[in-house]
A protein has these predicted regions:
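Short Ser/Thr-interspersed hydrophobic loop/turn segments at strand-loop and sheet-helix junctions
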Residues: 156-170, 192, 282-287
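ATP-dependent adenylate-handling active sites, centered on carboxylate activation for C-N bond formation
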Residues: 1-133, 170-216
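Generic recognition of short, well-ordered alpha-helical interface segments
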Residues: 151, 155, 159, 163, ...
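PAPS-dependent sulfotransferase catalytic core
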Residues: 217-270
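Structural motif
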Residues: 36, 142-155, 203, 264-280
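N-terminal glutamine amidotransferase
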Residues: 43-47, 224, 228-231, 283
Length: 287
C-alpha cells in the first residue's frame, strides 16, 4: 500500500525456516555479549540485503518507545479487569508458565514494579535455582510526570538505547550499513511530550501518528494489528529440540546451573519455553 502510494520499489525478505546453526552462531557472536533477543536474526538478514543496494537506510526504531506502542505500556497503565484478575489467580498455581510480566500478574500496584517486570523472567531463574535479583531499581521512573510520559521516558532512557538501538547498530554495521531513525530526533520527542496524555484514549496507543497517517491512508491500514519484527523462533527451536537439549546438557560451561528443569522446558512446549531454551543457548556462547 505504501509502495503503491509513493511509487517506491518494495521488496520482501523472507527468513528461512531451516536456519543453519553455524550461520545463527555467527550472528550471535556479533553482539559480543549474551543478547537473547531473537530479532537479531531478521535484523541481520535484512541489513545484509539492504547493504547490497544502499549504504544508508531509515528505520522505525523508537516509534513504539515514543508513542507507547508496546503491550507492556498498556498493561502497566491499565486498571485490573476481570481477565487480568483471572490470570492473577492462575499465576498463583502455575507461575512457571508465565514469562516476563509476572509481577504484573501478581497484582503489584507500583508502576515501576509493573513496568520492570516485563523486562525480566524471574520464574525462569527460579527454574534454574538462581535467586532473582531485584531489577526494579535499574529502571528510573520519573514520578514528576504523569504515568504515561514516565513510561515513555523510561523506554527512551533504558530499553531503546541498551536494547533496540544497540541491536540495530551491531547488525547493520556488520554489513557496512548505516541505519538512521527519525523517531529519535529530539524535536519530535519534545513535540510528542508537549501533548497532554489525554490524547491516548480507550487504551489506544500511537494516536498522534495514526491521526497523521489517516490523512493519506485508510483506517483498515492504519489500525491494522501490530506486527513484531521477529521470526518463528518457537517452530525453529522445537524442530531442533533434540539438538538444543543435548547441547545444553553436555555443556561444561553451564555446570554451575541446575539444568534438571530442562526436561520441563522440553516437555511443556510453548512460546515462552522456547524463548527460555534460546536464552540458555545464547548464554552458553559467552560463558
Amino acid at each position: 500500500i505504501v509502495s503503491e502510494k509513493y511509487n517506491t520499489n518494495h521488496q520482501s525478505v523472507i527468513v528461512p525456516t531451516n536456519l543453519n546453526f553455524d550461520y545463527v552462531n555467527s550472528i550471535i557472536n556479533l553482539m559480543d555479549e549474551p543478547y537473547a533477543d531473537p530479532s537479531i536474526i531478521p535484523s541481520f538478514i535484512i541489513s545484509n540485503e539492504i547493504s547490497k543496494h544502499y549504504k544508508v537506510a531509515i528505520s522505525g526504531d523508537g516509534g513504539d518507545e515514543l508513542l507507547g506502542g508496546y503491550e507492556r505500556t498498556k498493561l502497566s497503565l491499565s486498571k485490573s479487569s476481570k481477565f487480568e484478575n483471572y490470570l492473577s489467580k492462575l499465576y498463583k498455581f502455575y507461575p512457571s508458565y508465565f514469562g516476563t510480566g509476572s509481577k504484573f500478574l501478581s497484582k503489584s500496584s507500583e508502576l515501576q514494579v509493573k513496568y520492570s517486570s516485563f523486562l525480566e523472567d524471574n520464574n525462569f531463574l527460579k527454574l534454574l535455582k538462581i535467586n532473582p535479583q531485584n531489577t526494579d531499581s535499574y529502571i528510573n521512573i520519573n514520578n514528576e510526570l504523569d504515568d504515561y510520559k514516565s513510561l515513555i521516558l523510561a523506554d527512551y532512557q533504558f530499553f531503546l538505547p541498551d536494547m533496540m538501538m544497540y541491536k540495530v547498530d551491531r547488525m547493520s554495521m556488520a554489513n557496512s550499513l548505516e541505519v538512521r531513525s527519525p523517531f529519535v530526533d529530539h524535536k519530535l520527542i519534545e513535540y510528542v511530550l508537549s501533548h497532554n496524555s489525554t490524547y491516548r484514549k480507550d487504551n489506544e496507543n500511537k494516536l498522534l501518528l495514526k491521526n497523521y497517517l489517516l490523512e493519506d491512508f485508510n483506517k483498515d491500514f492504519v489500525y491494522r494489528k501490530k506486527q513484531g519484527f521477529v521470526f518463528d523462533l518457537e517452530s525453529w527451536i522445537y524442530k531442533n529440540l533434540d539438538y538444543f537439549y543435548d547441547y545444553l546438557l553436555s555443556s561444561t560451561k553451564l555446570k554451575e546451573f541446575d539444568l534438571s528443569s530442562l526436561n520441563l522446558l522440553k516437555i511443556n512446549k510453548s512460546r515462552i519455553n522456547s524463548q527460555r531454551i534460546w536464552k540458555l543457548y545464547v548464554l552458553e556462547k559467552f560463558i
